[in-house]
């Protein structure tokens, strides 16, 4: 094989080793790594290309041969050094003694992971080959695309395979190596269509043409045009190779002999010799190009990879903090652990009611919801006042006729005033109680959410806290409702300080005079100042003025008092009682084991997070050292 210059070789292996190390750590479970994925339709010659690159025989045959993603790690050794192979899957590793063992070992691994037969699996098989005859390169071979299910295959096998391929090639970190036979119409190949769907500009797609010896006479120039990027444009371009056919395999033509035969084929071909001269033909040239592409791709991806690892680390550490370290086994330490948990929760409950930051890290803010509810209450009072003002203008005359006694015209009937004010205030009582219940539900949900965040993994603690929250909500809501109804009973006593009422009355009179002056003009204003009308209409106008003035005072009082009652009972008192009851619960030490019984799967979640944290920290160390 053609060798790369010494300076480049010094850069190639470390780059590829870095990504291989990250993949072997399992980092790909957390984020996508730079890779070259090999895809092609069934019988596209995909396996032959990989055999030619790796120097080992891979599973062959009709139907689906590659049934699991195969990570093919090739490491170039110095001349004279021995061949080395290793296969790894599902945590087990097997060293291979001879290249001839590879095919059977892959079949065994596939049977173990995907079942005996023709099913497929998403699990990765890793095959490492070290030899003087391979390039420094890592590829991921994916199952060939099946169009129709054959005997023994699931009906949706084609859909399953496409789904598996899409999961790899959709990632921006993946270069798609699309294998297409020369003797088919390239535009109809499913593999190229799939690559174009996720990479429409061909930024990360490289085409490989196979089987050039099988093209029909007269179509050779079309093949040359495809390789020259003149038919379907790909920014990474095309290569063309000729690998061993079934006849040569049957005749036991070695891979080395096949490479010599390939070289002669392109060099001497009437049409394809130009591709050979331009460095776009033969497996060795393909190996060089793929190595170059992978290294450049890795170098471009490293800054983003570092950022992703840092983000994942931060996210994982935050999740681990939420899960905690789990309860200790010692009884005394276990009690302290429970006390810490409960104390942190109750302190957060108090903080929630005062609008301060929470220790659990949640961004719960009940005040924004309360502010909206109280603003709606204020708007309801204003709207009720506007409707009341419009209504009394129509109804005050009826009331005057009904309740007026022996007074002469011009005297205001206090009974009419009192009846109308009380009736309006009564209409505000039920909306206030409704607002209380809505806010009670909001606060209850916030406390329950806080319990879930504070007691992650401890279902009995959550259940106990929820029961207390529900009971306290009912109790405090009942107390608050009683206070509200008492407030409305008091509001039926028509009262305010004389000065307050006089000021409100003067303000209202001035507003109405200004409105009337604007409506009727300055002449009317002058007439009004010197003429004192003492007819029935004037009396009614005066009565309306008094009613509107008093309602304004009462509504302002309710706008503040109702929210104060709700906040005091549903937030302040609820949080204080929750704190008392949760701390009182700690007195029952016999209940401690029940409360600290962990969720059955929490241990595995914590172990999974710890494992992720460990591999991400190792990954970060690899990147720092690189």
From Swiss-Prot:
GO cellular component: cytoplasm; microtubule; nucleus; plasma membrane; presynapse
Domain GED: 540-626
Keyword check for NADP: no
Region of interest called G3 motif, as start-end residue ranges on this chain: 141-144
Record Pfam families: Dynamin_M (PF01031), Dynamin_N (PF00350), GED (PF02212)
Annotated region (G1 motif), positions in chain: 40-47
Chain positions recorded as GTP binding sites: 40-47, 141-145, 210-213
Gene Ontology biological process terms from the UniProt entry: defense response to virus; receptor internalization; synaptic vesicle budding from presynaptic endocytic zone membrane
Domain Dynamin-type G, chain residue ranges per copy: 30-303
Region called G4 motif, residue ranges: 210-213
Keywords (A to Z) from UniProt: Cytoplasm, GTP-binding, Nucleotide-binding
Predominant cellular place of this UniProt entry's protein: cytoplasm
Subcellular location: Cytoplasm
Keyword GTP-binding among UniProt keywords: yes
GO molecular function, one term: microtubule binding
Sequence segments annotated as region (G5 motif): 242-245
Name of this protein: Interferon-induced GTP-binding protein Mx
Native species: Epinephelus coioides
